[in-house]
Amino acid sequence: MAARLRPLLALLALAALCPQETLAQPLPTTDTWKSEGQVVDSYEASAQLCWADYREHMDLLEKDWCNWTVISRPYSALRDCLEVEAEVFSLGFPNPLAERVIFETHQLHFSNCSLEQPTLCDPPEDVLLAMIIAPICLIPFFVTLVVWRSKGTELKT
């Protein structure tokens, strides 16, 4: 067992002694931080354009914001716009900015929407009783049938 662990321990020691080479990532510099900040700023500007286009579409709707068939197209367009812009700037999606825009959308347009679900109630007692007693009565019948059929096959063999 110790022989199997020896290569793993050597690899772990190498990773601990040379962490930068094992990760194969250059050290971040102030220039890379500045360029990343510019990318995020550019993406934020693009996200604001997506948001403005979405708001324009939603303002055309007459406050029927809880009907999914009405709002699905502008909502999907917003999500697609945020995703495409994230890809343009080589950012992942979803990302914190996109999540913030979508969260703001939900707060602004969908905060008064609630999922309408029918209230479930118990069936009438006679139906409930039939649903309980029917399987209870069928169990002895099926047990008898299985035992009878299994005895018939034992006699033939």
UniProtKB/Swiss-Prot annotation:
Disulfide bonds: C50-C81, C66-C113
GO biological process: adherens junction assembly; angiogenesis; basement membrane assembly; bicellular tight junction assembly; calcium ion transport; cellular response to hormone stimulus; cellular response to vascular endothelial growth factor stimulus; G protein-coupled receptor signaling pathway
Subcellular location: Cell membrane
InterPro entries for this protein: RAMP (IPR006985), RAMP_sf (IPR038126)
Superkingdom in the source lineage: Eukaryota
Keywords: Cell membrane, Disulfide bond, Glycoprotein, Membrane, Receptor, Signal, Transmembrane, Transmembrane helix, Transport
Stretches that traverse the bilayer: 126-147
Designated name of the protein: Receptor activity-modifying protein 2
